[in-house]
Amino acid sequence: CIERSVLIPFSDDITFFYGNTGVGKTTLFNLINYVLGQELIRTQTIYEEVKGVCIDAFVCGQRLQIERKISSNMITVKDERDVFSFLAKGDSTSRVTFSDYLYKLAGLKPIEMLRGKSSKAVRVSFANFMWFAYLRQDELDNTLFYLGEQNGNFKKYASNYVMRVFLNESKEIEKEIVQEINKI
């Protein structure tokens, strides 16, 4: 068991992790996803050796320390002046979320999409975009966006929202147009 912090430097632009099977690439990505608000995939190594995850990053020119302890539902963010806490999972309508904070740093309003055939707006979280930051080679086909998922799989809907953001569609588009698109 490692009784110290492990520092893994990332590039300022983009970082690629490559290597043989079983060296920890997926585990590293899962830890990054966890600190950003997703569920942790608990392997024996994670269970035995990881107490928390902390990312030091520059986001929109501001240095942030983003931290989440194992078995915690709270994300703690420290900037140059303040400390903020966000629920990793929960009702995103009741308070400011971590995604809202990131959007604010970028000078954006939280992104919302109309859900399916209803006129209810749904927020697109930062985590929805993270699914496309790690691409498994065996998933680089028509299942990439989970559009074939049955029974209303949440990834199908969230992937649809992310694609619509890429295509510059948001709730500002008239509801009638979106409803017509959903009929197709």
Q: Model-predicted segments: where are they?
A:
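Extreme N-terminal "head/tail" segments of very large remodeling/mechanoenzyme assemblies
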Residues: 1-66
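Short beta-strand micro-motifs enriched in acidic
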Residues: 67-71
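Extended, charged alpha-helical "arm/stalk" segments used for dimerization and assembly
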Residues: 72-175
